Swiss-Prot record:
Binding-site list for substrate: P114, G115, V116, G117, G178
Keyword rRNA-binding belongs to the record: no
Protein name as catalogued: Peptide deformylase 1A, chloroplastic
A Pfam family annotated for this UniProt entry: Pep_deformylase
Tissue: Mainly expressed in roots. Lower expression in shoots, mature panicles at flowering stages and mature leaves.
Cofactor: Zn(2+)
Active site: E222
Family, similarity comment: Belongs to the polypeptide deformylase family.
Binding residue positions for Zn(2+): C179, H221, H225
GO cellular component, one term: chloroplast stroma
Principal EC category: hydrolase
């Protein structure tokens, strides 16, 4: 989920120089075959192909980056890994170099973007892992009225493996959301205001997070990714817009922004 850094223009945010990608990050991507499931390697390196080639330019990967494909290290809407359910991480695999490397990569990509949340499928890894973090610095860029309306408060980095989410109230709210896999766009999405998420931390220990307001929204957004759902699948369609049009009036007949 993208951080809302309002003082930066959309162009400045999207066209910021990309960080060099590590040359030794490999993840497993699930593909269907007549004989059942098989696994293949998706390498996130400057010489890699597949989704990374698309990230770097045209279909063959030879073009220059565009404003719509410059969030470094993320796959984009349309890639099958974003539209299929992710798989549980075996508890015994959590200490492994592979899983810990995936987590480190996710945190680095989220912070570089910058964003406030990321799910493993967004870096091409079909595993149930999410990371999220909202800092005072990120929040300081938002208008005070938005911070209050969204009930947005800073929280430290959270890593949750195999998260299970449940709502803890019937309260909902409509606010604009963005996504690092759908660069440059926003839309209104209705979310529950109070949730509880349980799972395992990066050390394999049980973790439970009770969240409300904006943190609850981030958790729902990232957990949706693990089910193959993007925010555009649940948005109010007529509110979909480019970032530069974020402050334009809503179409007639659209539900109002805020708590329901």
């Amino acid at each position: 989920m993208e951080a809302h850094l309002r003082p930066l223009s959309a162009a400045a945010l999207l066209l910021s120089p990309a960080a060099p990608l590590p040359t030794a990050v490999a993840a497993s991507a699930r593909r269907a075959s007549p004989g059942g499931r098989r696994w293949s390697s998706v390498r996130a390196s400057a010489g890699g192909g597949g989704w990374l080639s698309g990230l770097l330019g045209g279909k063959g990967g030879g073009g220059a980056p565009t404003a719509m494909t410059v969030t470094p290290g993320t796959v984009k809407a349309g890639d099958p890994v974003l539209h299929e359910p992710a798989q549980d991480v075996a508890p015994g695999d959590i200490p492994s170099e592979k899983v810990q490397g995936v987590i480190d990569r996710m945190v680095a990509v989220m912070r570089k973007a910058p964003g406030v949340g990321l799910a493993a499928p967004q870096i091409g890894v079909p595993l149930k892992i999410i990371v999220l973090e909202d800092t005072q610095e990120y929040i300081s860029y938002a208008p005070k009225k938005d911070i209050e309306a969204q009930d947005r408060r800073p929280f430290d980095l959270l890593v949750i493996i195999n998260p299970k989410l449940k709502t803890t109230s019937k309260r909902t709210a409509l606010f604009f959301e963005g996504c690092l896999s759908v660069d440059g766009y926003r839309a209104l999405v209705e979310r529950h205001l109070d949730v509880e998420v349980s799972g395992l931390d990066r050390n394999g220990r049980p973790i439970k997070v009770e969240a409300s307001g904006w943190q609850a929204r981030i958790l729902q957004h990232e957990c949706d990714h693990l089910e193959g759902t993007l925010y555009v699948d649940t948005m109010v369609p007529r509110t979909f817009r480019i970032v530069d049009n974020l402050d334009l009036p809503l179409p007639v007949g659209c539900p109002p922004i805020g708590a329901r």
